């Protein structure tokens, strides 16, 4: 069932409401301030629990998520109290460890279930220990932790993701303070470095859309296009012996359309660069001599729904908002293979690997295109609460009366008690597709020799309906004829891969809404709160690559305050938050 919207309403919702007036920029800026303040708050809680060790018992991942969401909710309620119809959490706090790519935001009552579901699981001896931290509920030394927070004011969304490292600590002789024992080394450090540099490079590249005459000649382009964005990110990943994980994106965001329902909602006039398995397949075939006669698809044969299919054929223009969300995985000491995502569920008895993680999704998103009369009273009550949360993902804990929690004395028992009642109605709501669960996903590498030896007798059109994909990318490997169901069956021969993630939201502000009277790029998130962790990579940018030469020129332009790129950062609120929020030596400049 699809929503019928008139052309007049479409003009208002997709065009008029997305013009960057001063009032809209203020809402974007406020959402960015709240998001960055919340990220600083979350980083402080982690530092106090796992670095400074000022707490007798460290906070669990579920408690960290809940306290941060409560902090965001309290801040949002203070902003635009009488000027915005809707405001709240746009992305519940997720804390993804190592190979867990996205979606890990456990409820407070999941700890006992995680141990029960995974009691027969065999521990993984490799460097990826995300499953270990997920089952125990606590972070461990050496974990690469991806923190994601987001909020919105009247549908104008700001989101940030930052990769943080949990270091082993030692006492400093001068003052006996706990400090990191040393930088992060190895493959994980390569991924963190590549993600950070790629994020900053794309930010500077988008700023060139405001002044195309400053676009480096090494790129061979006169406009900032989707193709150029992909070339820049791929060049950085190659230099650090890494690859871009499927699900990464640099896309335009609009009011209430921030990419939170990709694969479920076919967004009209979508603009963005998306990385999928099909792009890895194309790169493999392009590097093979035997594939010079690959049939190419004529782009002129467009269907009626092509506006919902994301392609690189677009130009970045002033007056738009963009989400830069990059996930990078290292390839060091790994065979050549395909990076793909594995969806986690809590069903046992499957004939899969013995080290597979079992867990249930926590993020829920209402689908307003579906209507159904529910039978259970608890289901109807839950649906009413979900309707009040709008189109953004939420958690059952956010629907309890105890939310938001008091950070000084949180009532965890009250939340757990209400969760039992809410779970009774969740099954009927999701079974009738009134709400969609956003899955927990792991990054896995399937060797190419396994894929090339696989047969697909059911045909390449056997799609996996349980995992929605972007329109136009239903077949993960179209040229090799591998369907999503067949690729899913090959995951039993895959390897876990750690992931680093960096994401920010930026505005391309026209001259009419800036204080300087000239166009500028406004970083809503990703300012001083996303300082890179202390790492050391064995790789560096390949200066012989023309694209890398352009990237280095972009870096110089971003530093030139007078003649370079006009980039302004949104600062977090200077309000008093717990002392845990101070950034310590665990977040120092990259070595």
Swiss-Prot record:
Primary localization: cytoplasm
Subcellular location: Cytoplasm; Nucleus
Record-linked InterPro entries: Creatinase/aminopeptidase-like, PA2G4/ARX1, WH-like_DNA-bd_sf
A GO cellular component entry from the record: nucleoplasm
EC number(s) reported in the record: 3.-.-.-
GO BP of this protein: proteolysis; ribosomal large subunit export from nucleus
Cleaved signal peptide residues: none
Domain of life, source organism: Eukaryota
Keyword entries, A-Z: Cytoplasm, Hydrolase, Metal-binding, Metalloprotease, Nucleus, Protease
EC main group: hydrolase
A molecular function (GO) term: metal ion binding
Subunit note: Component of the nucleoplasmic and cytoplasmic pre-60S ribosomal particles.
Function: Probable metalloprotease involved in proper assembly of pre-ribosomal particles during the biogenesis of the 60S ribosomal subunit. Accompanies the pre-60S particles to the cytoplasm.
Family named by the database record: Belongs to the peptidase M24 family.
Protein name from the UniProt record: Probable metalloprotease ARX1
Organism: Eremothecium gossypii (strain ATCC 10895 / CBS 109.51 / FGSC 9923 / NRRL Y-1056) (Yeast)
């Amino acid at each position: 069932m699809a929503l019928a919207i008139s052309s007049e309403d479409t003009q208002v919702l997709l065009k008029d409401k997305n013009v960057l007036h001063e009032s809209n920029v203020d809402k974007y800026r406020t959402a960015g301030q709240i998001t960055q303040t919340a990220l600083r708050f979350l980083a402080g809680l982690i530092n106090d629990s796992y670095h400074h060790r000022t707490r007798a018992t460290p906070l669990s991942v579920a408690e960290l998520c809940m306290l941060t969401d409560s902090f965001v909710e309290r801040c949002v309620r203070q902003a635009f109290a009488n000027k915005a119809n809707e405001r709240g959490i746009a992305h519940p706090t997720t804390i993804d460890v190592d190979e867990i790519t996205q979606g890990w935001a456990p409820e407070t009552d999941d700890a006992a279930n995680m141990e029960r579901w995974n009691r027969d699981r065999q521990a993984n001896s490799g460097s990826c220990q995300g499953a270990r931290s997920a089952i125990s509920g606590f972070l461990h030394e050496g974990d690469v932790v991806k923190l994601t927070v987001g909020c919105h004011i009247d549908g104008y969304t700001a989101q940030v993701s930052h990769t943080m490292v949990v270091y082993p600590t030692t006492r400093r002789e001068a003052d006996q303070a706990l400090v990191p024992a040393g930088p992060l080394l190895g493959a994980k450090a390569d991924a963190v470095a590549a993600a950070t540099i790629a994020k900053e490079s794309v930010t500077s590249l988008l700023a060139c859309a405001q002044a195309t005459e400053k676009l480096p000649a090494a790129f061979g382009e006169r406009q900032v296009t989707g193709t150029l964005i992909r070339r820049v990110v791929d060049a950085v990943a190659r230099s650090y012996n890494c690859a871009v994980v499927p699900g990464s994106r640099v896309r335009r965001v609009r009011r209430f359309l921030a990419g939170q329902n990709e694969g479920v909602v076919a967004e009209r006039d979508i603009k963005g660069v998306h990385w999928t398995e099909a792009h890895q397949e194309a790169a493999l075939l392009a590097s093979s001599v035997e594939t010079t006669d690959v049939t190419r698809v004529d782009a002129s044969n467009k269907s009626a729904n092509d506006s919902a299919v994301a392609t690189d054929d677009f130009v970045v223009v002033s007056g738009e908002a963009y989400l830069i969300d990059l996930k990078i995985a290292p390839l060091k000491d790994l065979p050549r293979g395909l990076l793909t995502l594995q969806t986690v569920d809590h069903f046992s008895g499957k004939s899969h690997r013995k080290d597979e993680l079992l867990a249930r999704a926590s993020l829920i998103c209402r689908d307003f295109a579906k209507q159904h009369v529910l039978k259970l009273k608890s289901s109807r009550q839950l649906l009413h609460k979900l309707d009040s949360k709008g189109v953004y993902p939420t958690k059952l804990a956010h629907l309890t009366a105890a939310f938001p929690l008091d950070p000084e004395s949180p009532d965890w028992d009250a939340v757990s008690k209400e969760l039992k009642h809410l779970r009774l109605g969740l099954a009927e709501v999701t079974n009738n597709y009134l709400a969609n669960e956003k899955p927990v996903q792991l990054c896995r590498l399937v060797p190419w020799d396994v894929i090339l030896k696989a047969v697909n007798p059911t045909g390449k059109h056997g799609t996996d309906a349980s995992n929605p994909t972007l329109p136009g990318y239903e077949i993960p490997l179209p040229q090799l004829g591998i369907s999503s169901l067949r690729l899913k069956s090959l995951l039993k021969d895959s390897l876990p891969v750690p992931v680093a993630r960096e994401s920010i939201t930026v505005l391309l502000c026209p001259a009419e809404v800036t204080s300087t009277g000239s166009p500028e790029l406004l970083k809503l998130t990703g300012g001083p709160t996303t300082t890179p962790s202390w790492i050391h990579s064995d790789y560096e940018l390949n200066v012989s690559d023309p694209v890398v030469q352009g990237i280095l020129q972009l870096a110089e332009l971003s530093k030139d305050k007078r003649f370079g790129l006009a980039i302004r950062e949104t600062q977090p609120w200077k309000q008093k938050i717990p002392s845990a929020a101070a950034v310590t030596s665990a977040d120092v400049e990259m070595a």
